Each structure stands twice: as structure tokens, then as C-alpha cells.
UniProtKB/Swiss-Prot annotation:
It is found in: Cytoplasm; Secreted; Cell surface. It comes from Ectopseudomonas mendocina (strain ymp) (Pseudomonas mendocina). It is an enzyme of class 4 (lyase). Mg(2+) binds at D246, E289, D316. SMART domains: Enolase_C (SM01192), Enolase_N (SM01193). The gene is eno. Its main location: cytoplasm. Its cofactor is Mg(2+). This is Enolase. It holds the Pfam family Enolase_N.
Length: 429
């Protein structure tokens, strides 16, 4: 038994300079597992609650001392003496103690930090890497794959102070022979994109996730700049590299319309579905996240019927890593993929349940960071340990993003051929 003898919480900073929660779970024998909770900017209304203090005299009200106190008090008291390797029992106990639908009492940030720290401590106690422990918890021991990275190299929307409405423009090195090759390709494209933007006299400052954040004439202008960078890097768009979008449509859905302020265009759901379909015809876009508002299920149905057979349609704000909401999407044939974010649901156990439900229904599962991140690289191990096949963890700069890529390099080196990189086969169409 990997007996928990102490739990400690603390307030640390995320990549935006805002407080977040870190937890240590300490086992008999001195083993320590540590984990941080991430934080989002464009958040779904149905996400589990991130508990913040609201005290304007500290960190502009964003302090997390209440969540930390919950770790050091009731959560610690609850879990002392328990077995860290029994992840389900730990998570269920915390969920039951909280007693709310959205973890509003203890805070999803408090519960998640402890949940992940316990998993890390348990992996050490077993003498295995974290990804191997996660595979065991997932019921798929020894089954691994290296994820295709979806690299966010132009930022807009809530992730940047520019006029671009679509939040993320991503490249996917689907033609790479392994993850290390994919990372190199992405980095080369990133540097060529900087040169393309500089040549156009555009800003090359980066946004929250490390992508460039220039003002552009249109969303399509961003795609054209990326296409030029891909070609300049010596790769063939559509073969070596494909494209993906995160529209984060809930951020520009106003009064029942999709309002692209940067382009001066307003669409109803059918019109916006046509707009997105047009982009997929002109560019090799094989994945679109949050193409409709989180509450516009009718719009999602229109989009799914129009392009869902050939394009991965990912629900982020729509599904919020929640199996109850995902089940509705599966039953109604809304979308065909789920974005997986630990802190939307607030525990490792519930995260694994969402991945399992998605895969059983033929949906893909994309493991994702948040725009407010730390050096914690747990999502890299989650992607490999669940053989999810895809990961979103930002651009090719900022160590809060690169820490995940570097962990994936280490894992690929450890596993060798036991973790295949499947490239284009991970996607639809």
C-alpha cells in the first residue's frame, strides 16, 4: 500500500501571472508527487468551478488561498492514511466531500491538484513512469501511442490582443515519421512564419499560448500566412502538414448570431457553417474546435451534417470533459470529437471516463492544455498513457508550452517503437 502521510497545498503563479494551486501528496517512505492546476481564458459555462478568493486587495481578486486552505484542511483530513494507487477511491471521496455538481465547495482547482499529485506519487511508489500508471488506471496497460501535436502558431480571440476573431490557427505535422520529427517540423514552420510576418511588416509578439498575434485583414489571411510559412520550410501543405482551427465561437456569438468583428461579417448558424466549410475547401483543415456556440446545439447539428464526415469537429466549451454532456452529443450525433481538459471536470478519474466514453462511441479525444499553464507536464503523460493520439499544447515557444513537448520527447525515447506515431491516421476523412 502506498500510504498517504501528508498533503500540502500552496499558491503558485501560472503563465499569465495569475495565482493557481499546487499540491504535494507525500507517501510513507518520503515519496512526493506534486501537481499544479491550469486555468482557462475562454471557458465553457458548464465547467467545474475554479475557486478564487475574490479579495481585490490580493492579485486583483484572483488569489486561491481558499482552495489552498481546502487542501490543507478538509482534503488532507479526508485522504490521510489512504492508498495513493487507488485513484478512483481518492477522487470519489473528494467529489463526495465537495457534494456539489460543479465542485464549487472545495474548488475544482483544489481537487484536481491533489488528484494529479496522488497519481504522480503512486507512479513513483510503483516504480513506473506516470504514463504507464495512467495506462493501468485506464484499463489499457502497456498500450501507448505518441500524439500528433496541434501547434497553435497564430493566436487570436481571447488569447491575444489583436483583431483576429478565430482563437487558434494550428499546424499538424501529420507526415512526420515520429514525434521528434513532428516537433522539429513544427518548430521550423514557426520560425518561417515569423519571417513571413516580419516581411509583411506585422507584429511578431506572441499571445498566451506562444503563437504570433498580429493584426490581420481576415481569418483567411492567417491561413494564407501559415501556408506560405509551410512552403518556405520545405513542406507540402495537405501531405506533410495539415491545418486545424479553434474558433472558440462562444466568444463571438451575440444575440443568436456569429459576429466576426475583425472581418465585419455577421452570420446565422447555417451561414457560419457555410463559412467554415468554405475554408475547409480552400485549405487542408482537418479539425475544427468549437465551430458553434456551446449552447447552439442546432447549429452544431448543421455543422456536423455539413462537414462532419471529413472534418474532425471537436467539442470543448460544448462538452467540457463532462460525460453527461458528451453522452448527449453522442446520442444526437453532434460533433465527432471531444477536447480533454483536466480542470474542466476536476479529477483524473472523471477525465479518464470521458476519454473512454468518447473512444467507445467512435469519437476522437484531443488532450489539451489551458491558456493559463505552468511547468507541469502531466498532459504529456496522459496523451501517451491513454493512446489518445492527439495533443494541443500551444506553440513552439514559452516554456509553459515547451515543457509538454520536451516531456513527450523523453517518453518517446524511453518507449521507442512501443509508442507509434500514427500521423494522418488519427483523423477523419
Amino acid at each position: 500500500m502506498a500510504k498517504i502521510v501528508d498533503i500540502k497545498g500552496r499558491e503558485v503563479l501560472d503563465s499569465r501571472g495569475n495565482p493557481t494551486v499546487e499540491a504535494d501528496v507525500i507517501l510513507e517512505g518520503g515519496i512526493v508527487g506534486s501537481a499544479c492546476a491550469p486555468s482557462g481564458a475562454s471557458t465553457g459555462s458548464r465547467e467545474a468551478l475554479e475557486l478564487r478568493d475574490g479579495d481585490k486587495s490580493r492579485y486583483l481578486g484572483k488569489g486561491v488561498l481558499k482552495a489552498v486552505a481546502n487542501i490543507n484542511g478538509p482534503i488532507r483530513d479526508l485522504l490521510l492514511g489512504k492508498d495513493a494507487t487507488d485513484q478512483q477511491a481518492l477522487d470519489r471521496a473528494m467529489i463526495e466531500l465537495d457534494g456539489t455538481e460543479n465542485k464549487a465547495k472545495l474548488g475544482a482547482n483544489a481537487i484536481l491538484a491533489v488528484s494529479l499529485a496522488a497519481a504522480k506519487a503512486a507512479a513513483q511508489a510503483k516504480g513506473v513512469p506516470l504514463y504507464a500508471h495512467i495506462a493501468d488506471l485506464n484499463g489499457t496497460p502497456g498500450v501507448y501511442s505518441m500524439p500528433v501535436p496541434m501547434m497553435n502558431i497564430i493566436n487570436g480571440g481571447e488569447h491575444a490582443d489583436n483583431n483576429v476573431d478565430i482563437q487558434e490557427f494550428m499546424v499538424q505535422p501529420v507526415g512526420a515519421k515520429n514525434f521528434a520529427d513532428a516537433l522539429r517540423m513544427g518548430a521550423e514552420i514557426f520560425h518561417h512564419l515569423k519571417a513571413v510576418l516580419k516581411a509583411r511588416g506585422l507584429n511578431t509578439a506572441v499571445g498566451d499560448e506562444g503563437g504570433f498575434a498580429p493584426n490581420l485583414a481576415s481569418n483567411e489571411d492567417a491561413l494564407a500566412a501559415i501556408a506560405e510559412a509551410v512552403a518556405n520550410a520545405g513542406y507540402k501543405l495537405g501531405d506533410d502538414v495539415t491545418l486545424a482551427l479553434d474558433c472558440a465561437s462562444s466568444e463571438f456569438f451575440k444575440d443568436g448570431k456569429y459576429d466576426l468583428e475583425g472581418e465585419g461579417k455577421v452570420f446565422d448558424a447555417a451561414g457560419f457553417a457555410d463559412y467554415l466549410a468554405g475554408l475547409t475547401q480552400r485549405y487542408p483543415i482537418i479539425s475544427i474546435e468549437d465551430g458553434m456556440d456551446e449552447s447552439d446545439w442546432a447549429g452544431w447539428k448543421v455543422l456536423t451534417d455539413k462537414i462532419g464526415a471529413k472534418v474532425q469537429l471537436v467539442g470543448d466549451d460544448l462538452f467540457v470533459t463532462n460525460t453527461k454532456i458528451l453522452k448527449r452529443g453522442i446520442d444526437e450525433k453532434i460533433g465527432n470529437s471531444i477536447l480533454i481538459k483536466f480542470n474542466q471536470i476536476g479529477s483524473l478519474t472523471e477525465t479518464l471516463e470521458a476519454i473512454q466514453m468518447a473512444k467507445a462511441a467512435g469519437f476522437t479525444a484531443v488532450i489539451s492544455h489551458r491558456s493559463g499553464e505552468t511547468e507541469d507536464s502531466t498532459i504529456a503523460d496522459l496523451a501517451v498513457g491513454t493512446a489518445a493520439g492527439q495533443i494541443k499544447t500551444g506553440s513552439l515557444c514559452r516554456s509553459d508550452r515547451v515543457s509538454k513537448y520536451n516531456q513527450l520527447l523523453r517518453i518517446e525515447e524511453q518507449l521507442g517503437g512501443k509508442a507509434p506515431y500514427k500521423g494522418r491516421a488519427e483523423f477523419r476523412g
